[in-house]
Amino acid sequence: MDKLLIEGGKVLSGEVAMSGAKNAALPILCASLLTSDPVHFTNVPHLNDISTMLRLLGDMGVGVTMDGIDGIVLNGGGLNNPVASYEMVKTMRASILVLGPLVARCGEARVSLPGGCAIGARPVDQHIKGLQAMGAEVKVEQGYVHAKATRLKGARICTDMVTVTGTENLMMAACLAEGETVIENAAREPEVVDLANCLVSMGARISGAGTDVIRIQGVDKLHGATHAIMPDRIETGTYLCAAAATGGDIRLLKTSAAYLDTVVDKLMDAGCEITVERDAIRLVAPKRLKAVSLRTAPYPAFPTDMQAQFMAINCIADGVATIRETIFENRFMHVNELMRLGANIQIEGNNAIVRGVDRLEGATVMATDLRASASLVIAGLVAQGETVIDRIYHLDRGYERIEEKLAKLGAAVRRVH
């Protein structure tokens, strides 16, 4: 199993390009199931979750062709097996995103209940409830969601909670439904908007993406299109935090601050200077960061996927910060590992109180989920001596070539097998 070795104490500087967003790419790849025409995607990140999704789509009969460095052409003309088996799904919860498109196009789907991250329960009941409202017959048996419908009917759906994958699944299904579907309490995330833009380029009729009410007028069929995946805002935020923690000066290319307002604001509160360009962001960090408190909540509030990284920078900041997690239970698994490096953190329910210390010291730590592992990398970059991070397959699920990108910015980091 791969490990990451980090020699701490190097200041990050220079330029590096960001990748396409995993959380936009996964649903957008599933959108190819809605048409028999080829769909061309660019700026697709090279990540384990993407490879898993492409294997899953291939198993269903979708033609997968690589095109250049970051391009993929998917052809759903040969779609003949609307099944997502446990073997394919167990490592990645996003595989539930095939459910809506399959029912809409094939009239049937069997999708194993998903695996993926270890950060608490993520029920698919909102997806099921929405499909039932659209006339699908849905059963959950032997660990599979089995859905059937001759043709889905437009419906008014109000989800019990804000769910990103639920919104995406139902929006895709509604594209081929008969009549109008209205999704209320819809997720407003930029990745939902990117998916909607892709679907519209394929001939879908969607309005309101990016607000909490999305309207979809069903059409008889969708066609091929070309779509560039949006930049990864969480990867961007993670590198900004890494530079901030090390007192660095970096410029991130092929990205946008448009969806990062809360993250940028918090980094400025911590004392960083940030310059936003059209397709780039520059951060200049102070000698020592100031502690910043935060509360996670659905977009456009502070993203839960940046919580662990901000905990890491607060570990060595001046002052005391309170971090309140309101999205997922069980999302403080990085705390014990950060404490092995010398952090001073106290958990009280869904709050973490972080008291900044003067220095962290390298140790062996274990990654427990994708964003937790990113926080350990940031802490390792500032810790004195060597930090060894075990189980970095979690990192590979969401960060493309992280050791190469960090090394380009001057970090002493290498992967060992």
UniProtKB/Swiss-Prot annotation:
The modification 2-(S-cysteinyl)pyruvic acid O-phosphothioketal is found at residue 117. One of its GO terms (biological process) is cell division. UDP-N-acetyl-alpha-D-glucosamine binds at residues 93, 122-126, 305, 327. It catalyses: phosphoenolpyruvate + UDP-N-acetyl-alpha-D-glucosamine = UDP-N-acetyl-3-O-(1-carboxyvinyl)-alpha-D-glucosamine + phosphate. Phosphoenolpyruvate binds at residues 22-23. HAMAP family: MurA (MF_00111). This is UDP-N-acetylglucosamine 1-carboxyvinyltransferase.
